[in-house]
């Protein structure tokens, strides 16, 4: 166990180097000058000499590889640099935005599971009946709907027409959280309902279920004590995928609802060419996916000892 965890964490180093190097290179290849844009955005007319001095101050006059090496060394020691726009420490900025993203992640995942697991089970149990067709139909509609479209529809009906919730984030965090949570849950619950249904159907056709039915065991007992236990690995995989992607920040949803999380922070940084913020966001995405996958593997191992850490079957 310890050996496997150490191996996975060591794997994070080349992953971080590869991903951050590529993003570093792509930002430079995208063209434009961060310093020039910074002054233009501030509405300040400055001379070329001031621009050159600022570039030197930020180390942007140095060769690409030198810039990257300095940034990566700083990140490894906890120094992510300073934002070009806000002039604040990148680490402090990131920590400030992270709680909002964590809150949105937890609420969205919780609502998704509360919707998708019962509906997936109901659809499987009522296989090829009216309720099954209805659940599959609405799951298809929800899965086909882009997040931005769902956000605009919810915003129009629940905010503009009915006035139940604020259009964008306000000081009332509880009310402001509802629409972005619903937006994310619609898409995820639609997709996961279909996957839960497929998993439950597969389990219901296995011999141990048929044997339990033949012995007169009630259907609800079979579902909750036997089938659900065997389906937990699939559900955990869904949770891991959701948490990993959401903790990276749901850029579109956070931007539409002005939810002040790391996703919106990344969009603002890209717009402003705030390289240190962008690089910190990319590094965070890489770290969170490796860590979430590691935790998922460990949970797999404890739920089903036949699964060896490393992915092999015992």
Feature-to-residue mapping (PLM):
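Cytoplasmic-entry segments and transmembrane alpha-helices of multi-pass inner-membrane transporters
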Residues: 2-7, 11, 118-154, 233
């Amino acid at each position: 166990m310890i050996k496997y965890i150490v191996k996975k964490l060591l794997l994070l180093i080349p992953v971080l180097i590869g991903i951050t190097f590529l993003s570093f290179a792509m930002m430079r290849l995208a063209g434009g000058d961060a310093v020039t844009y910074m002054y233009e955005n501030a509405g300040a007319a400055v001379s070329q000499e001031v621009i050159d001095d600022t570039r030197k101050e930020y180390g942007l006059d140095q060769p690409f590889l030198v810039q990257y090496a300095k940034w990566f060394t700083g990140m490894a020691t906890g120094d992510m640099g300073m934002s070009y726009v806000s002039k604040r420490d990148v680490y402090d900025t990131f920590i400030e935005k992270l709680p909002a993203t964590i809150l949105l992640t937890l609420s969205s995942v919780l609502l998704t599971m509360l919707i998708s697991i019962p509906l997936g089970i109901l659809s499987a149990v009522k296989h090829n009946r009216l309720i099954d067709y209805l659940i599959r139909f609405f799951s298809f509609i929800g899965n086909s709907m882009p997040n931005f479209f769902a956000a605009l529809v919810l915003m129009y009906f629940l905010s503009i027409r009915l006035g139940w919730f604020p259009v964008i984030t306000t000081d009332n965090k509880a009310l402001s959280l509802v629409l972005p949570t619903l937006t994310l849950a619609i898409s995820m619950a639609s997709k996961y309902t279909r996957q839960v249904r497929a998993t439950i159907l597969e389990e219901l056709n296995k011999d141990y279920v048929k044997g339990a039915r033949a012995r007169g065991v009630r259907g609800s007992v079979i579902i909750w004590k036997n089938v659900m236990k065997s389906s937990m690995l699939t559900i955990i995989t869904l949770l891991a995928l959701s948490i990993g992607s959401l903790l990276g920040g749901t850029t579109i949803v956070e931007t539409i609802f002005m939810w002040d999380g790391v996703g919106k922070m990344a969009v603002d940084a890209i717009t402003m060419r705030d390289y240190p913020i962008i690089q910190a966001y990319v590094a965070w995405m890489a770290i969170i996916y490796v860590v979430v996958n590691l935790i998922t593997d460990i949970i797999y191992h404890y739920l089903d000892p036949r699964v060896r850490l490393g992915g092999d079957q015992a």
